[in-house]
Amino acid sequence: MASFASLVKKELTQLEVHPEHAKAELSALIRMNGSLTLMAHRFVLNIQTENPAIARRIYSLIRQVYHHEANLVVHRKMKLKKNYQYIVRLTEGVNDILSDLSILDPDTMAISTTVPTSVLKEPQRMRSYLRGAFLASGSVNNPETSRYHLEIYSLYDNHNAGILKMMNHFHLNARTVERRSGYIVYLKEAEKIADFLQVIGATNAMLKFEDVRIMRDMRNSVNRLVNCENANMNKTIDAAQKQIENINYLKNHVGLDNLPAKLREIAVLRLAHPDVSLQELGAMMPSGQISKSGVNHRLRKLNQIAEGYQQPEDA
Protein backbone atom coordinates (compact mmCIF):
# COMPACT_ATOMS: atom_id res chain seq x y z
CA MET A 1 0.00 0.00 0.00
CA ALA A 2 1.36 3.40 -1.00
CA SER A 3 2.26 5.81 1.78
CA PHE A 4 0.30 9.03 2.19
CA ALA A 5 3.39 11.02 1.12
CA SER A 6 3.55 8.95 -2.09
CA LEU A 7 -0.11 9.68 -2.81
CA VAL A 8 0.51 13.40 -2.33
CA LYS A 9 3.50 13.37 -4.68
CA LYS A 10 1.65 11.32 -7.28
CA GLU A 11 -1.13 13.91 -7.35
CA LEU A 12 1.37 16.76 -7.65
CA THR A 13 3.11 15.15 -10.62
CA GLN A 14 -0.20 15.10 -12.51
CA LEU A 15 -0.93 18.82 -12.21
CA GLU A 16 -0.92 20.98 -15.31
CA VAL A 17 0.90 24.27 -14.80
CA HIS A 18 1.63 27.48 -16.70
CA PRO A 19 5.18 27.57 -18.18
CA GLU A 20 6.27 30.37 -15.82
CA HIS A 21 5.06 28.38 -12.83
CA ALA A 22 6.66 25.25 -14.26
CA LYS A 23 9.97 27.15 -14.19
CA ALA A 24 9.59 27.82 -10.46
CA GLU A 25 8.84 24.15 -9.82
CA LEU A 26 11.80 23.07 -11.96
CA SER A 27 14.04 25.57 -10.19
CA ALA A 28 13.34 23.84 -6.86
CA LEU A 29 13.66 20.31 -8.24
CA ILE A 30 16.99 21.01 -9.93
CA ARG A 31 18.42 23.16 -7.12
CA MET A 32 17.62 20.47 -4.55
CA ASN A 33 18.11 17.22 -6.47
CA GLY A 34 20.40 18.22 -9.32
CA SER A 35 24.14 17.82 -9.79
CA LEU A 36 26.54 18.99 -12.48
CA THR A 37 29.35 17.06 -14.10
CA LEU A 38 31.77 18.21 -16.75
CA MET A 39 31.88 16.03 -19.83
CA ALA A 40 33.74 16.88 -23.03
CA HIS A 41 34.19 20.50 -21.88
CA ARG A 42 30.48 21.05 -21.23
CA PHE A 43 28.11 20.66 -18.32
CA VAL A 44 25.86 17.63 -17.95
CA LEU A 45 22.93 18.00 -15.56
CA ASN A 46 21.73 14.98 -13.57
CA ILE A 47 18.52 15.23 -11.53
CA GLN A 48 18.04 12.24 -9.23
CA THR A 49 14.95 10.81 -7.56
CA GLU A 50 13.72 7.45 -6.28
CA ASN A 51 10.19 8.19 -7.49
CA PRO A 52 9.46 7.32 -11.14
CA ALA A 53 6.48 9.70 -11.28
CA ILE A 54 8.72 12.60 -10.20
CA ALA A 55 11.31 11.60 -12.82
CA ARG A 56 8.60 11.72 -15.51
CA ARG A 57 7.47 15.07 -14.15
CA ILE A 58 10.97 16.57 -14.43
CA TYR A 59 11.37 15.14 -17.93
CA SER A 60 8.00 16.59 -19.02
CA LEU A 61 8.59 20.03 -17.52
CA ILE A 62 11.98 20.37 -19.24
CA ARG A 63 10.42 19.42 -22.56
CA GLN A 64 7.39 21.68 -22.00
CA VAL A 65 9.32 24.79 -20.99
CA TYR A 66 12.65 24.47 -22.82
CA HIS A 67 11.85 22.06 -25.66
CA HIS A 68 14.84 19.87 -24.83
CA GLU A 69 14.76 16.09 -24.71
CA ALA A 70 16.42 14.68 -21.63
CA ASN A 71 17.56 11.09 -21.11
CA LEU A 72 16.13 8.88 -18.39
CA VAL A 73 18.65 6.59 -16.70
CA VAL A 74 17.61 3.93 -14.19
CA HIS A 75 19.98 2.42 -11.61
CA ARG A 76 19.33 -0.16 -8.92
CA LYS A 77 20.62 1.35 -5.66
CA MET A 78 21.74 -1.96 -4.13
CA LYS A 79 21.67 -5.47 -5.52
CA LEU A 80 19.73 -6.82 -2.55
CA LYS A 81 17.13 -4.04 -2.58
CA LYS A 82 14.28 -3.31 -4.95
CA ASN A 83 14.85 0.46 -4.80
CA TYR A 84 15.74 2.11 -8.06
CA GLN A 85 17.29 5.48 -8.66
CA TYR A 86 15.96 7.47 -11.60
CA ILE A 87 18.22 10.06 -13.19
CA VAL A 88 16.94 12.65 -15.63
CA ARG A 89 20.06 13.56 -17.60
CA LEU A 90 20.31 16.69 -19.71
CA THR A 91 23.28 17.22 -22.02
CA GLU A 92 22.05 20.05 -24.25
CA GLY A 93 21.37 23.66 -23.24
CA VAL A 94 22.34 23.09 -19.62
CA ASN A 95 24.00 26.50 -19.12
CA ASP A 96 21.08 28.40 -20.62
CA ILE A 97 18.47 26.49 -18.59
CA LEU A 98 20.33 26.85 -15.30
CA SER A 99 20.89 30.54 -15.99
CA ASP A 100 17.22 31.06 -16.80
CA LEU A 101 16.26 29.35 -13.54
CA SER A 102 18.69 31.55 -11.55
CA ILE A 103 20.73 28.53 -10.51
CA LEU A 104 23.90 29.32 -12.47
CA ASP A 105 25.48 32.75 -12.92
CA PRO A 106 26.49 32.84 -16.62
CA ASP A 107 29.33 35.29 -15.96
CA THR A 108 30.98 33.79 -12.89
CA MET A 109 29.64 30.22 -13.33
CA ALA A 110 28.78 30.29 -9.60
CA ILE A 111 25.95 28.11 -8.32
CA SER A 112 23.19 29.88 -6.36
CA THR A 113 21.72 28.03 -3.38
CA THR A 114 19.11 30.68 -2.56
CA VAL A 115 15.47 30.85 -3.64
CA PRO A 116 15.33 33.25 -6.63
CA THR A 117 14.05 36.77 -5.94
CA SER A 118 11.65 36.45 -8.88
CA VAL A 119 9.97 33.55 -7.08
CA LEU A 120 9.68 35.39 -3.75
CA LYS A 121 7.91 38.30 -5.44
CA GLU A 122 4.95 36.36 -6.81
CA PRO A 123 2.59 34.10 -4.77
CA GLN A 124 1.83 31.64 -7.57
CA ARG A 125 5.54 31.12 -8.22
CA MET A 126 6.03 30.56 -4.49
CA ARG A 127 3.33 27.87 -4.58
CA SER A 128 5.04 26.21 -7.53
CA TYR A 129 8.49 26.41 -5.95
CA LEU A 130 7.15 24.87 -2.73
CA ARG A 131 5.55 22.13 -4.80
CA GLY A 132 8.91 21.39 -6.42
CA ALA A 133 10.66 21.50 -3.04
CA PHE A 134 8.18 19.03 -1.56
CA LEU A 135 8.59 16.71 -4.55
CA ALA A 136 12.37 16.96 -4.20
CA SER A 137 12.79 16.34 -0.48
CA GLY A 138 9.48 16.61 1.34
CA SER A 139 7.68 14.10 3.51
CA VAL A 140 4.41 13.96 5.42
CA ASN A 141 3.15 11.45 7.96
CA ASN A 142 0.00 9.44 7.41
CA PRO A 143 -2.76 11.39 9.22
CA GLU A 144 -3.86 8.14 10.89
CA THR A 145 -0.56 7.91 12.80
CA SER A 146 -0.06 9.16 16.33
CA ARG A 147 1.43 12.51 15.33
CA TYR A 148 1.06 15.02 12.52
CA HIS A 149 4.31 16.00 10.80
CA LEU A 150 5.35 17.49 7.44
CA GLU A 151 8.86 18.58 6.53
CA ILE A 152 11.06 19.77 3.67
CA TYR A 153 14.80 19.14 3.83
CA SER A 154 17.40 21.58 2.50
CA LEU A 155 21.15 21.13 2.32
CA TYR A 156 21.89 24.86 2.64
CA ASP A 157 20.88 27.29 5.37
CA ASN A 158 20.04 30.15 2.98
CA HIS A 159 17.80 27.92 0.88
CA ASN A 160 16.10 26.63 4.02
CA ALA A 161 15.44 30.24 5.05
CA GLY A 162 13.75 30.86 1.71
CA ILE A 163 11.50 27.82 2.14
CA LEU A 164 10.58 29.01 5.64
CA LYS A 165 9.81 32.51 4.37
CA MET A 166 7.54 31.24 1.59
CA MET A 167 5.65 28.85 3.84
CA ASN A 168 5.03 31.56 6.41
CA HIS A 169 3.90 33.92 3.65
CA PHE A 170 0.89 31.61 3.53
CA HIS A 171 0.49 31.81 7.35
CA LEU A 172 1.52 28.21 7.96
CA ASN A 173 3.39 28.83 11.22
CA ALA A 174 6.34 26.80 9.90
CA ARG A 175 9.41 26.22 12.03
CA THR A 176 12.95 25.19 11.26
CA VAL A 177 15.63 23.08 12.88
CA GLU A 178 19.21 22.24 11.95
CA ARG A 179 20.23 18.66 11.36
CA ARG A 180 23.76 17.33 11.13
CA SER A 181 23.53 16.99 7.36
CA GLY A 182 21.37 20.05 6.67
CA TYR A 183 18.18 21.84 7.68
CA ILE A 184 14.46 21.18 7.72
CA VAL A 185 11.36 23.34 7.72
CA TYR A 186 8.48 21.52 9.39
CA LEU A 187 4.81 21.73 10.34
CA LYS A 188 3.21 20.00 13.34
CA GLU A 189 -0.34 21.37 13.29
CA ALA A 190 -2.88 19.30 11.37
CA GLU A 191 -4.73 22.35 10.03
CA LYS A 192 -1.48 23.91 8.77
CA ILE A 193 -0.47 20.68 7.04
CA ALA A 194 -3.84 20.63 5.27
CA ASP A 195 -3.35 24.29 4.30
CA PHE A 196 0.12 23.52 2.90
CA LEU A 197 -1.26 20.68 0.76
CA GLN A 198 -3.82 23.14 -0.60
CA VAL A 199 -1.10 25.73 -1.27
CA ILE A 200 0.97 23.36 -3.41
CA GLY A 201 -2.06 22.06 -5.31
CA ALA A 202 -2.61 18.66 -3.70
CA THR A 203 -6.35 19.25 -3.28
CA ASN A 204 -7.43 15.60 -3.28
CA ALA A 205 -4.74 14.69 -0.75
CA MET A 206 -5.80 17.64 1.39
CA LEU A 207 -9.43 16.45 1.37
CA LYS A 208 -8.36 12.92 2.28
CA PHE A 209 -6.10 14.27 5.03
CA GLU A 210 -8.99 16.32 6.44
CA ASP A 211 -11.41 13.36 6.26
CA VAL A 212 -9.00 11.12 8.14
CA ARG A 213 -8.15 13.87 10.63
CA ILE A 214 -11.82 14.60 11.36
CA MET A 215 -12.62 10.90 11.82
CA ARG A 216 -9.57 10.50 14.05
CA ASP A 217 -10.53 13.53 16.14
CA MET A 218 -14.10 12.24 16.39
CA ARG A 219 -12.86 8.84 17.58
CA ASN A 220 -10.64 10.54 20.14
CA SER A 221 -13.57 12.68 21.32
CA VAL A 222 -15.81 9.62 21.61
CA ASN A 223 -13.10 7.75 23.50
CA ARG A 224 -12.65 10.67 25.88
CA LEU A 225 -16.42 10.86 26.38
CA VAL A 226 -16.67 7.12 27.00
CA ASN A 227 -13.76 7.26 29.43
CA CYS A 228 -15.38 10.18 31.21
CA GLU A 229 -18.73 8.37 31.38
CA ASN A 230 -17.01 5.22 32.62
CA ALA A 231 -15.21 7.23 35.28
CA ASN A 232 -18.48 8.87 36.33
CA MET A 233 -20.20 5.49 36.34
CA ASN A 234 -17.46 4.04 38.52
CA LYS A 235 -17.83 6.97 40.91
CA THR A 236 -21.60 6.41 41.01
CA ILE A 237 -21.15 2.69 41.67
CA ASP A 238 -18.61 3.38 44.41
CA ALA A 239 -20.92 5.96 45.99
CA ALA A 240 -23.90 3.57 45.86
CA GLN A 241 -21.80 0.79 47.39
CA LYS A 242 -20.71 3.11 50.19
CA GLN A 243 -24.32 4.14 50.80
CA ILE A 244 -25.46 0.51 51.06
CA GLU A 245 -22.59 -0.37 53.41
CA ASN A 246 -23.49 2.55 55.69
CA ILE A 247 -27.21 1.76 55.60
CA ASN A 248 -26.51 -1.87 56.49
CA TYR A 249 -24.29 -0.67 59.33
CA LEU A 250 -27.13 1.48 60.67
CA LYS A 251 -29.58 -1.38 60.20
CA ASN A 252 -27.39 -3.75 62.23
CA HIS A 253 -26.16 -1.34 64.91
CA VAL A 254 -28.87 1.28 65.27
CA GLY A 255 -31.96 -0.11 63.60
CA LEU A 256 -33.65 1.60 60.67
CA ASP A 257 -36.81 2.07 62.74
CA ASN A 258 -34.84 4.43 64.97
CA LEU A 259 -34.05 6.76 62.06
CA PRO A 260 -36.17 9.81 61.20
CA ALA A 261 -39.03 8.87 58.85
CA LYS A 262 -37.57 10.56 55.75
CA LEU A 263 -34.17 8.93 56.24
CA ARG A 264 -35.72 5.55 57.04
CA GLU A 265 -37.76 5.72 53.85
CA ILE A 266 -34.76 6.43 51.60
CA ALA A 267 -32.64 3.82 53.43
CA VAL A 268 -35.20 1.05 52.86
CA LEU A 269 -35.62 2.10 49.23
CA ARG A 270 -31.86 2.14 48.55
CA LEU A 271 -31.43 -1.36 50.03
CA ALA A 272 -34.30 -2.62 47.87
CA HIS A 273 -32.92 -0.99 44.71
CA PRO A 274 -29.10 -0.85 44.95
CA ASP A 275 -28.51 -0.35 41.21
CA VAL A 276 -30.90 2.49 40.31
CA SER A 277 -29.90 6.13 39.91
CA LEU A 278 -30.66 8.90 42.39
CA GLN A 279 -33.26 10.31 40.02
CA GLU A 280 -35.01 6.94 39.81
CA LEU A 281 -34.91 6.60 43.60
CA GLY A 282 -36.56 9.99 43.93
CA ALA A 283 -39.40 8.90 41.65
CA MET A 284 -39.99 5.75 43.73
CA MET A 285 -40.45 7.48 47.09
CA PRO A 286 -43.66 6.10 48.73
CA SER A 287 -44.39 9.41 50.43
CA GLY A 288 -44.12 11.32 47.17
CA GLN A 289 -41.56 12.02 44.48
CA ILE A 290 -38.53 14.12 45.41
CA SER A 291 -35.70 15.60 43.35
CA LYS A 292 -32.32 14.04 42.68
CA SER A 293 -30.69 16.64 44.95
CA GLY A 294 -33.21 15.79 47.68
CA VAL A 295 -32.30 12.09 47.44
CA ASN A 296 -28.61 12.94 47.49
CA HIS A 297 -29.06 15.13 50.57
CA ARG A 298 -30.80 12.34 52.52
CA LEU A 299 -28.22 9.72 51.53
CA ARG A 300 -25.39 12.05 52.56
CA LYS A 301 -27.12 12.49 55.91
CA LEU A 302 -27.28 8.70 56.33
CA ASN A 303 -23.55 8.49 55.52
CA GLN A 304 -22.77 11.14 58.14
CA ILE A 305 -24.80 9.33 60.81
CA ALA A 306 -23.15 5.97 60.03
CA GLU A 307 -19.66 7.48 60.03
CA GLY A 308 -20.45 9.17 63.32
CA TYR A 309 -21.28 5.81 64.89
CA GLN A 310 -18.27 4.11 63.29
CA GLN A 311 -15.65 6.58 64.58
CA PRO A 312 -15.66 5.41 68.22
CA GLU A 313 -15.15 1.82 67.06
CA ASP A 314 -12.20 2.84 64.89
CA ALA A 315 -10.58 4.79 67.74
Curated annotation (Swiss-Prot):
Assigned keywords, A-Z: Cell cycle, Cell division, DNA-binding
Coiled coil: none
GO term, biological process aspect, one: cell division
One of the record's GO molecular function terms: DNA binding
Pfam families: HTH_WhiA (PF02650), LAGLIDADG_WhiA (PF14527), WhiA_N (PF10298)
InterPro entries assigned to the protein according to its UniProt record, in alphabetical order: Homing_endonucl, Sporu_reg_WhiA_N_dom, Sporulation_regulator_WhiA, Sporulation_regulator_WhiA_C, WhiA_LAGLIDADG_dom
Keyword flag Transferase: no
Residues that span the membrane, as ranges: none
DNA-binding region ranges: 277-311
Top-level lineage group: Bacteria
HAMAP family reported for this sequence: HTH_type_WhiA
Stated role: Involved in cell division and chromosome segregation.
Family according to the record: Belongs to the WhiA family.
PANTHER family: CELL DIVISION PROTEIN WHIA-RELATED
Protein name: Probable cell division protein WhiA
